[in-house]
Amino acid sequence: MLRIARTLNRSPLASPLARGIHQSTPKTNPSPLLSSTPTQYSSMKVASLKDECRRRGLRLGGRKADLIERLASHDFSTVSKRAVVSTPNPVAAPAQTATAAGATATLTRVRLITSSAPTLAQGDTSTIDFCKLPHTGMPADAPRIKIPTSPDAYGEVARYGSHAITNDRKVAESVAEDELHSKQPQEIHYASGHVVRSFAGDHSSETGDHDFSTNDKLVLGGIVGAVGFWWFLGLEGKVE
């Protein structure tokens, strides 16, 4: 399996099969398998890798791929610590072996992912830079349109309550009082000294005595006499 992977890496037509991950916070200890830059530990033997792990104080167990990943992670963490911690008077580091120098030169070309969010507390590992909350306020209601309406009796009672009923009663009482005064006799004084009393009002329901003329009396008398004579003749025929 390692031989096939080594052959693909040496092939000029082979494209890197690494996938980049966008992250807003720095990752201090990434896996070297996600890096597109090949490391120099691939050409070393297992014994050499174990010696290097023993020199750095790392665990010796595992396969060759595990040893390579362990060494690459240690190199990356060392470079990250050097980039974060800055000293005013840097001291020259002791000379390292050619293998360590090559690993450092390879890892310096890796661009570190930084975050725009400031660290608010010690050990803050949050991956959220900012959040946007939706606007939860309800919109204001539109102003009501006032429409004028024609006045009516129900509206007056509903608006003014018992005052409208009291006013209607007063008006009805005043009208009745006026009608009562109009039915009382009124005296009219003339210049000659005569006094005439007149009644004003509705006389349609009053019944009065009407004088009949002479012709009317004769006609009515004739009708009554004819009816009486006819009745008398009928009664006389029944007796016989």
UniProtKB/Swiss-Prot annotation:
PROSITE patterns: SAP (PS50800). This is Altered inheritance of mitochondria protein 34, mitochondrial. Belongs to the AIM34 family. Keywords: Membrane, Mitochondrion, Transit peptide, Transmembrane, Transmembrane helix. The chain crosses the membrane at residues 218-235. Residues 1-28 form a transit peptide. Residues 13-48 are annotated as: Disordered. InterPro entries: SAP_dom, SAP_dom_sf. It comes from the Eukaryota. It is found in: Mitochondrion membrane. GO terms for cellular component: mitochondrial membrane. It is a single-pass membrane protein. Residues 41-75 form the SAP domain. Residues 22-45 have a biased composition (Polar residues). It holds the Pfam family SAP.
